[in-house]
Amino acid sequence: MSNLNLLRYYQRIITIGVGSEIKTTVQEVADLLCTSPRHARNLLSQMQELDWLTWQPKAGRNQRSTLLLNIELSALKESLALERIQQGKYERALAILDEDEAMFGRLLKTTSGTSVQEGRVNIQLTYKRMFERIVPHQLHRCSERFFLRQVYCCLVSSHDNGVVRPELAHHWRYDEDNYQWTFYLRPGLTFHNDTPIDADTVVSLFAKLSALPYYQKELAHVTDITAPHPLKVVFTLNKPDRGFAGLISGVKYGIQPAGQVNVANNNSVIGSGPFSVVEHDKNKLKLQAFDGYYACRVLVDLVTIWIVNDEKMENPSLSSNAPIQVSETTSGIEVSIQTPNASHSSQHSRTEDGCLFALFNQHTKHPLTRAQRRYITELIHPQRLLELFRKEKTHYGSVLANNLLPIWSPVLRQFGEVSVLPKTITIAGYNYTALRRCARAISSVLTEHGSKVQIVMYSYRELSEKAENGTLNETLILTNTNLDDNRHASAFSNFYSNNVLYHTLGEVNARWLDEQLENVRAFTPLEDYLTALEPIASTLISEYWIAPMFHHTQTLRFHGVLEDVSLTNWGWPDIRSVWSSD
């Protein structure tokens, strides 16, 4: 008899209690089990073999035997569910737990990790929020952008030093006289559904993208896209753009079927990258290695990310036979790898290419004066906020920020003189642990100085939409930025396409910012973008439009059998190259 059938019978006798010997007869046990005495003896024997109970029968009719139940029903269910999870029978495990998703999630975390079968590596992770649809043409948070990079390829990529590298296009060139960028595609490219990718595919896709508000500003200077032959795409611009290849190396320019752009609310997506999406629902995201990937096939076969809504889940991890828990913590994303009895361990830490900062909103009903902005900047200095976190015993693994990127020189500003603050100050941000805690800390400081503070937290997309349609009217806006792997182009886009930043600056300052960025785009090589953007960011800070606070520290800890685990810009482990020597 299967363990699941035995469980049903065990549930019937659990009423006698666990851990205490009782004297009973076979007939009495049979009555509890709703079966015959003969079948009852068989059931008791099978349960005893599994150590669920201890049965000491006495010979003779109506002799009272000894029965001891060894395990609580809840513990038994967990044990059986755990076995099913390890076998990949997730629906059965959930049924055993009576559809208790919280318990199911906790068991998932204890079993997540890597499994190696005949050299093939499968990864299972847990994450505490549901992923949005993995498509490039929607605004996404950091984790979704990481998965965009796994599911889609661009025409080209750009290294963190700004050097452009081939992807679906093997060569490219820029005609400075005619403002034309030409890309030459590899032959034999296909999407995950085996549909061919050629120049017409790219032209159709970019025609669709150009019509979307999400792309209109970045692609406004593209006047024509043509396909002279199936492996050649030509972009004609109306103004110079030396870094255009870097722009389209961004995750939002991942190559997808043009028809997918019009499809909404369908998680079954078709990409062109190293992994394909085989399942995506409210419970999990499952990726499978794509054998038709243009480059070397990834080393991992399957990656499953289970959604576990557990507020206690703070630290992500990755390992073999060990918990993998990935979540956005107060200090960004941390990845810890723990393997029992591991013979070696390692740790990598890096300061993110990004920043958590406050914006002073010019579109609020009563905009702050320069003196007030300067004074508040002093009041909410990150060192002061850090002291508040320490008093509250809140772990905040971050570096104090004096500019928007840690590689940029600190912006030194004079201390703000005391200024009368508004009676009411409103703070907005998006629903992210670090922003919520910063908002509460800032509220505490400003309340001490006589202001009544109200905090509103929007969804990530809602915050951007309110800025775009002009209805974001809170006094202070808390947000953050984090560069993708194409650092130079990503930094540019984080300024140029940032609805929230442009909205808070007001029309005059926004025009100034546009002029500076257009100048960068026209005359600066991609590899020099970060150098060119630094004085622009520093000016916004020195004029008290932006108040930098923290750079998050990203950490990857691991013990055990996995080889060459590295940390990506998004704070997630590089699942493409994880492998095991076992």
Feature-to-residue mapping (PLM):
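Surface-exposed binding/hinge segments that line
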Residues: 66, 74, 217-260, 274-279, ...
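Short, solvent-exposed loop/beta-turn-alpha elements that line the ligand-binding surface or hinge
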Residues: 145-174, 251-272, 362-367, 407-413, ...
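Aromatic-rich, solvent-exposed beta-strand/loop patch
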Residues: 236-252, 269-312, 339-354
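Bilobed periplasmic-binding protein-like "clamshell/Venus-flytrap" ligand-binding domains
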Residues: 419-429, 523-558
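Acidic-aromatic pocket-rim loops
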Residues: 467-521
